[in-house]
């Protein structure tokens, strides 16, 4: 992937606009989870060290376009940045006609979704963003799959458009896992439905040496192998699709499962062979034999891509399968990349964040890359790099 990188540019005295992903949860005017801001801090610090006249913008929540709404203001993010950077940070509300920034100063441009034309990516708005800067830096991988004014349009018209360190790192890690994987490559895909992950499964079936399926997705494959899945979440209309994927790909067969009578935190868990599942059972996790077999596969891998838990890990009695998988990934010397909201929650629960080679910041963008789709905000950077 050939893009201009911010790290290679001289930013001294230049007006630099960074599109970051600062879409963080806020409660009572305070940031409640700072992961995305923390991920962006090295980019901000580097630009300031390089002497840039620095502006940064992001969306936050889903406000009505064209209307200011304090609930979705970036003010709490500004307060957080002041503390984190130990320097003054200004919030600019009306900035589309220009904003004064000194070298080494940071100005946060208010929620870009307050601007009319942001989501539709109107040329008028894109040109206004572009006029604010000498260098545009796209550093929000989480929104790279959306062609919006602040992610795509501005990159068309800015004098220079480049990738920030976070975006460049994300593309490098995904490229390493998907485009040039060291083999054997194992992909783990969990989640509740085959239908929502079908393109991911089809794409990975062409790349992975072994494709591990978990969660509700696995139930459809268990049914496709001719077993009873009782009252479990299962897409019976996709059994033929599962059979086709199983025939074309090396998908390890689940041999035992953990079942319960109902979806509840207090329902007792019972380990059963897949052959013994009854009409009243609901499958909520893989059993210990299956988990051990998958852990062995993971330990022999050279590349691991993980998207989605293999059981209802939020309930402790159905968490063991995902825990075993997580610990195997943590112990494996392979290059590992993980992405998707539930996956990140599982990584947090089992405390393995520092043992995964790369944790992707993008949910939808991560999946679209894995599906082999073009990410518009990356495509425009590649186009500009060629020009």
From Swiss-Prot:
GO biological process, one term: gluconeogenesis
UniProt-listed SUPFAM superfamilies: Phosphoglycerate kinase
Catalytic activity: (2R)-3-phosphoglycerate + ATP = (2R)-3-phospho-glyceroyl phosphate + ADP
InterPro entries, sorted: Phosphoglycerate_kinase, Phosphoglycerate_kinase_CS, Phosphoglycerate_kinase_N, Phosphoglycerate_kinase_sf
E.C. no: 2.7.2.3
Subcellular location: Cytoplasm
UniProt-recorded name of the protein: Phosphoglycerate kinase
Organism encoding this protein: Aeromonas hydrophila subsp. hydrophila (strain ATCC 7966 / DSM 30187 / BCRC 13018 / CCUG 14551 / JCM 1027 / KCTC 2358 / NCIMB 9240 / NCTC 8049)
């Amino acid at each position: 992937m050939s893009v201009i990188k911010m790290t290679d540019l001289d930013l001294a005295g230049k007006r630099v606009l960074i599109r970051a992903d600062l879409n963080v949860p806020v409660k009572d005017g305070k940031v409640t989870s700072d992961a995305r801001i923390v991920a962006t801090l090295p980019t901000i610090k580097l630009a300031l060290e390089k002497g840039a006249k620095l502006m940064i913008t992001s969306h936050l929540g889903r406000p009505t376009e064209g209307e200011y709404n304090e609930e979705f203001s970036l003010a709490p993010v500004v307060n957080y940045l002041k503390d984190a950077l130990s320097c003054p940070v200004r919030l600019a509300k009306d900035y589309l006609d220009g904003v004064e920034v000194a070298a080494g100063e940071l100005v946060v441009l208010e929620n870009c979704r307050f601007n009319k034309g942001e989501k539709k990516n109107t040329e008028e708005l894109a040109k206004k963003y572009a006029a604010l800067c000498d260098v545009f830096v796209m550093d929000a991988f989480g929104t790279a799959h959306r062609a919006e004014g602040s992610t795509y349009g501005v990159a068309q018209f800015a004098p220079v458009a480049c990738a920030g360190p976070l975006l460049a790192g994300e593309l490098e890690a995904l490229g390493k896992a998907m485009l040039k994987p060291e083999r054997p490559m194992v992909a783990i895909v969990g989640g509740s439905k085959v239908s929502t992950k079908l393109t991911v499964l089809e794409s990975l079936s062409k790349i992975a040496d072994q494709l591990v399926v978990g969660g509700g997705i696995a139930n459809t494959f268990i049914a496709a192998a001719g077993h009873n899945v009782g009252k479990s979440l299962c897409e019976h209309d996709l059994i033929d699709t599962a059979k086709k994927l199983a025939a074309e790909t090396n998908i390890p067969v689940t041999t035992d499962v953990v079942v319960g009578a109902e979806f509840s935190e207090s329902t007792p868990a019972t380990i059963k062979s897949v052959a013994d599942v009854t009409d009243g059972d609901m499958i909520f996790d893989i059993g210990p034999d299956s988990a051990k077999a998958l852990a062995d596969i993971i330990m022999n891998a050279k590349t691991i891509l993980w998207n989605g838990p293999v059981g209802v890990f939020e309930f402790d009695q159905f968490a063991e399968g995902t825990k075993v998988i997580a610990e195997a990934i943590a112990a494996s010397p392979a290059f590992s990349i993980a992405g998707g909201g539930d996956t990140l929650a599982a990584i947090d629960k089992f405390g393995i964040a520092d043992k995964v080679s790369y944790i992707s910041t993008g949910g939808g963008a991560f999946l679209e890359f894995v599906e082999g789709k073009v990410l518009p905000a990356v495509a425009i950077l590649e186009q500009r790099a060629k020009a």
